[in-house]
Amino acid sequence: MPVKLKWPWLGIAIPSFLIASIGYCAHYFILLNFLSLRKQLWYQFCQTMIWLSYYLAIYTPPGKPPTNFKPSKNEWKVYCKKCKCYKPERSHHCKTCNQCVLMMDHHCPWTMNCVGYNNFPHFIRFLFWVIVGTTSLAIFLTTRIHSIWVHRSSPSYLYYKSELIFLTILTPLNAFILLTISILMIRCLFNQIFNGRSQIESWEMDRLETLARMSKLLPILIENVWYIFPNLRNEHVESQAEALLNKKRLSLDELVNFPYDLGPFRNAIQLLGTPPLWLYPFSGPQDDGLHFQKNEESMIEDPNSLNDIILCLPWPPDSTKHLNSTSEHTSNVQIISEEGEQVIRIRTPEKKLSRSEWLNDWGESLEDFGVDVDVE
């Protein structure tokens, strides 16, 4: 679950303190005593890349839409009242940064910045170099501990007391940093590279799966098909809609296609730019972050197949801002006729699955990623 700090500046101070204290204390008190010059230079190179990528992740703007942006045809037209412009696909308004962010992944408290389209490569490189640096240090520290243990019968004056103290402190601390950053890196790679999704979009997929499991998703998708593709509505497609609504079991793959998943390699190119420059500290994505290439499933192959049309809906496919009949908050009042008289009944309230209130298995809401739900 995302961390929320009482004083935001701590988000920069804590990582900076850890990078400096672990990196330079380990070098001065431990590595200088036994490590070769070549390995020391490699270690300091990793430290430099950590600082540089962290600086770029903090100060590189994530990207925001121009005020004259116009959504493409067959895309949701979502207007941000605060930025006074339309949001491009995959964009959200960050409550902390007070701006719409292109391809918003999340607001990161440890950079005091949103992770978005323009600075995602810097964020990933920062995680990468932290993992490389802490892994290298873990190997060096383990080697030193093993050497001291093997020669434990040697006179104590052969070892500096400060070295033993810092070995005791820095070894578990470095291992903890390596573990936590590795978990975050794996999550980012799994979402963005292997599935093509931001953390917000992965959260959306979990929410859609819940709606589908409760049989609440399909009616919204069909209404959205009539809204986005009105020219494809005919008796044949309507009969398919009725048949689908009567079908008891439908998998999520039959209802939802995530349009931006192009495969791991193409996802990486779209996010990080040209492969030879992935580790170059100043490289970034090649496009503008306003429009994104979509996969083949997003193209209508058979206009007479409702299943194909549903998979071509823009993301998220269950948007209800334009609908009156199907919304997140429906009335509990029901009017029916009994023996020629109109009777008002109060229906049993259903469990609310509002997009702004829903929580995933990690206990995360849309607001936890930094999104301003009031303008969603």
Curated annotation (Swiss-Prot):
Q: What Pfam families does its record include?
A: DHHC (PF01529)
Q: Cross-referenced HAMAP family, in alphabetical order?
A: DHHC_PAT_PFA4
Q: Does the keyword Plastid apply?
A: no
Annotated transmembrane regions: 12-32, 41-61, 123-143, 164-184
Instruction: Return the EC number.
Output: 2.3.1.225
What region holds the DHHC domain? Answer: 78-128
Q: What is this protein called?
A: Palmitoyltransferase PFA4
Q: What Gene Ontology molecular-function terms does this entry list?
A: protein-cysteine S-palmitoyltransferase activity
Species for this entry: Candida glabrata (strain ATCC 2001 / BCRC 20586 / JCM 3761 / NBRC 0622 / NRRL Y-65 / CBS 138) (Yeast)
Among its keywords, does the record have Transmembrane helix? yes
Which reactions is this enzyme annotated as catalysing?
L-cysteinyl-[protein] + hexadecanoyl-CoA = S-hexadecanoyl-L-cysteinyl-[protein] + CoA
